[in-house]
Design a protein with these regions (language model features):
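Active-site pocket-lining/capping segments in soluble small-molecule metabolic enzymes
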Residues: 108-113, 222, 236-259, 269-274, ...
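N-terminal amphipathic alpha-helix/helix-capping segment at the start of soluble metabolic enzymes
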Residues: 5, 86-132, 139, 254-260, ...
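Hydrophobic faces of well-ordered beta-strands that scaffold small-molecule active sites
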Residues: 130-136, 158-162, 188-192, 217-219, ...
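Short, acidic/polar
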Residues: 139-152, 174, 200-206, 276-286, ...
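Active-site-adjacent beta->alpha loops and helix N-cap segments on the catalytic face
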Residues: 117, 141-143, 168-180, 198-204, ...
Length: 419
């Protein structure tokens, strides 16, 4: 009876989704469970111009929340308990059964525990790094393609991201593709998505990955699955968001160090094109406090926007290591360009559209990418993350080969402090 009355009232007042562990008092009286992904700490990286990634005709719930209240960088909300869904939150409040998932929880400061990876060492030593993204194939046969790529690029990159179900399309897991990368003496960056994991499963799989030899991990909320109806439904809420994943792994660092002799290097995603920019920056600070040690951005197509975002990100932290790696798209086919334009959270600048309208666009597209890369280098980027969208192998290799020399030239022109 109490639940039915509460449901009736709160649905009318707050569009309540009956999670049973109400956080309205912490979210400016806006129900965060109206996020289709069910995020307790948002927004996700797919937000552009304040709109929802899943339902773009709607405003992003978390953008509304974060503009109405100050984000506490050193706390987070844990994933809600499923057993409390569709129960009376007032009863749960009195009983205390929702305490951990209702109240903001403090993050754990494990920043004194050094990560075990070579990528971490290079970044904290302020070496310029080049990382490359290789999508995991759908089947094991596709690993032959990964092998061919690694034979070409192994001596040109510091690490290789291997994806898991990129864009929500089923594929081999990142850890499987990464075995090919590791065999060539290159450190992989393993991806885990909150869309796919409850916390116990995440920690179990991450520990298994460390035992294989992996040290770098990118923890992402994840994209909406293409075959799932778009709407707000308890059944499609994601088990975890990226902040919760980072917090969970960060809380285990001391145990990993003492028991395994390994400390993972935790990374996250960021989006310089989410607006208002202050929310994007504050959320990245939140992830940093929770334990993220590095960040790879969404594809950068407008260096000026990146510069403004990065300056805001670095404000007051000028003496700290530079740990943000902007992603540079190499676009070599019209079909792949269309894919880029449809990716959640990716802003495609008019300058790239003009290049892709040319009859013979591959060389101009490569020169455009060189210009973007040099611009972000001049503004203090820790490195570049290369994403291929249909560019021929020889042009990818040219880009990777020239990155370090171009970085030296870009930094020599820069007014940015490198000390």
């Amino acid at each position: 009876m109490i639940y039915q009355i509460e449901k009736l009232i709160k649905e009318k007042l707050f569009d309540c989704k009956s999670c049973g562990q109400c956080v309205l008092s912490h979210t400016a009286m806006i129900c965060p469970m109206n996020c289709p992904k069910g995020l307790r700490n948002g927004p996700c990286g797919g937000t552009l111009e304040g709109r929802c990634e899943v339902l773009p005709d709607r405003d992003c719930v978390w953008m509304q929340i974060d503009q109405k209240r100050e984000i506490a960088p050193d706390t987070l909300h844990l994933a809600p308990k499923k057993e409390l869904f569709n129960t009376a939150s007032y009863v749960n409040l009195v009983k205390g059964s929702d305490r951990r998932t209702r109240l903001p929880q403090p993050v754990v400061d494990a920043s004194h525990i050094a990560a075990s990876s070579e990528l971490a060492r290079k970044m904290y030593d302020q070496e310029f790094v080049v990382t490359l993204e290789i999508p995991s194939p759908r089947t094991a046969d596709g690993l032959k393609r990964v092998e061919r790529i690694m034979r070409r690029v192994a001596d040109k990159v510091d690490a290789v991201n291997t994806t898991t179900n990129a864009g929500g399309v089923p594929s081999l897991h990142s850890t499987e593709t990464a075995k090919v990368v590791l065999a060539h003496g290159v450190e992989p960056v393993i991806q885990f998505c909150g869309r796919d994991h409850e916390e116990p499963e995440l920690l179990e799989e991450l520990e298994a990955a460390m035992e294989i030899g992996y040290r770098n991990f990118l923890l992402l909320t994840g994209d909406w699955l293409p075959d799932v109806d778009r709407g707000v439904d308890q059944q499609t809420w994601f088990p975890m968001d990226s902040l919760q994943m980072i917090h969970a792994v960060n809380g285990k660092l001391e145990d990993y160090r003492d028991r395994l002799g390994i400390v993972p290097f935790i990374g996250c995603a960021s989006n310089p094109f989410s607006t208002p920019t202050t929310v994007s920056v504050q959320r990245l600070h939140n992830k940093r406090h929770a334990g993220a040690r590095f960040s790879q951005t969404q594809a950068i197509t407008n260096p000026a926007a990146f510069s403004d975002w990065y300056a805001l990100l670095r404000k007051g932290r000028e003496d700290e290591p530079k740990l943000a790696i902007p992603s540079i798209p190499l676009v070599g086919s019209q079909r792949a360009f269309e894919v880029l334009c449809r990716l959640p959270g990716v802003f495609v600048d008019a300058s790239l559209h003009r290049v892709m309208e040319m009859e013979d666009f591959q060389r101009p597209s490569l020169e455009w990418a060189f210009k973007v890369a040099e611009d972000v280098m001049e503004h203090g980027a820790a490195g570049v993350h290369v994403m291929n969208f249909g560019m021929p192998a020889e042009l990818i290799d040219e880009f990777l080969t020239e990155m370090r020399d171009r970085n030296v030239r870009a930094r020599s022109r820069s007014e940015y402090s490198w000390t």
